[in-house]
């Protein structure tokens, strides 16, 4: 894998090369909604999961819990659970062979749990794209894992009590790519000096 960031250090000043692979990965990543059926390699999964563990967390607390699911029966169960809160048609995970779930403490226990888990998901999606995998952010995990069925599944995963679902990603080899990049909206950011 090519390094994602070029940093040149001179006289204790850091100069970043403004065209680098990290920025390219961020700008070219897209939500993939069609996957090839073959499973991703173990080392690819490990790279994506490890990238998630390096996401920033409030006060370095490392609250999120990451669960990767490749068992087809459990994926089918997750899909059925998600459909109960899904208004679309078809598989909410788009047939991906791997689902990565992120959990965190309840907001009453740790106020940054949703923020921390979201950063984990973002890191994993960018990492996936950087090694040629496709991913798509999937919602409704909070509702899914608040059910009795969801709580039983969290126990099966060996997770501690008191966690809530933050989100998940569908993960696999892309079967197709979005044809165009939507232009960024005008006035997306402001710089105040």
Spans of features found by a protein language model:
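N-terminal polybasic/positive-inside topogenic patches
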Residues: 7-9
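Acidic, surface-exposed loops and disordered segments
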Residues: 11-193
């Amino acid at each position: 894998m090519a390094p994602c960031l070029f940093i040149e250090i001179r006289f204790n000043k850091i100069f970043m090369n403004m065209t680098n692979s990290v920025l390219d990965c961020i700008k070219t990543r897209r939500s993939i909604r069609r996957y090839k059926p073959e499973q991703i390699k173990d080392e690819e999964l490990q790279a994506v999961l490890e990238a998630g563990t390096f996401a920033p967390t409030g006060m370095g607390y490392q609250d999120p819990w990451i669960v990767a699911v490749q068992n087809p029966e459990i994926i089918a169960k997750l899909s059925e659970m998600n459909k109960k809160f899904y208004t679309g048609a078809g598989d909410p995970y788009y047939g991906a062979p791997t689902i990565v779930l992120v959990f965190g403490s309840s907001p009453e226990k740790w106020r940054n749990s949703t923020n921390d888990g979201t950063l984990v998901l973002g890191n994993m999606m960018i990492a996936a794209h950087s090694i040629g995998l496709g991913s798509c952010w999937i919602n409704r995990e909070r509702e899914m894992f608040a059910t009795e069925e969801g709580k039983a599944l969290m126990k099966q995963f060996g997770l501690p009590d008191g966690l809530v679902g933050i989100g998940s990603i569908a993960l696999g080899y892309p079967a197709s790519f979005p044809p165009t990049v939507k232009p960024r909206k005008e006035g997306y950011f402001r710089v105040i000096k």
